[in-house]
Amino acid sequence: MIIDGHSHACGRFLTPDSIVKTLDTNGVDKVILVPGELNSKSEYSLPNIASIFPRRNVVKVTNYLTKFVMILTGKVKNILIGNEHVYELTQKTNGRVIQFVWITTQINKPSNYLDNKKKDWNFKGVKLHQCWESFSVDSDFFKEVALWAENNDIPLFIHLYSDSEVAKIIEYKKKHLNLNLIIAHLFGIELFIKLNFKDENLYFDTSTLQLISKNRLMNAIDFVGADVLVQREMEFRVN
């Protein structure tokens, strides 16, 4: 089974028909989906920055730009509506959409929201994004969401903003080995390697081609082990 492990519900993943068409065209069985730009069919072309700076974590640059745009537009306020939209897509695509719920700081009690939506939607993972809004790994908000995910054996997928947040999440993960944690875009893989920190419940998302160089990808494979990474990834995704 082939699963797209990181997509947003906009562009070609906005409607049931376009999702099925995209998956079929690319020979993909399912997609892990979170909210995106609400009701937008727009497609954005991203230059291959990674090829220019193959040894750099260029996601840092896109993080700054994303945060600036989010401050100007306030689009994070649409994420909860986006969660509803992703659930509707799961109901109209015959099992081909796997829902991850995106949690934002606008939710007063994240654990209650997650409890209720788990009953209603049976989602398969939780998403956090430090570029769309400001919160830290050492905040009560993060700890509540992460603890809920750990206690419910639900993967937590996080897009980190900075190197300092990478250091914090490594320290958090050392104390929570049962948390199934996915780090988006190989962010901070260099620090994981430097500290030689890995465990059987730690995963790294490798999207996307324009942001992840072959050099950094090979370093990650050398560190984790290609066979182990693929096996873990497939077991997690299918289950």
Where do the language-model regions lie?
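Glycine-enriched alpha-helix->loop->beta-strand junction motifs that scaffold or abut catalytic
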Residues: G27-V28, D120-G125, E144, W148-P155, ...
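Acidic-and-aromatic substrate-binding clefts and catalytic sites of carbohydrate-active enzymes
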Residues: A9-P16, N39-S42, K75-N78, T104-S111, ...
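Hydrophobic faces of well-ordered beta-strands that scaffold small-molecule active sites
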Residues: I3-S7, V31-L33, V97-V101, K124-L128, ...
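Short, flexible active-site-adjacent loop segments at beta-strand->alpha-helix junctions, enriched
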Residues: D29, E37, I103-T105, W132, ...
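H/E-rich (His + Asp/Glu) clusters that bind or coordinate divalent metals
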Residues: F13, N180, L186-N239
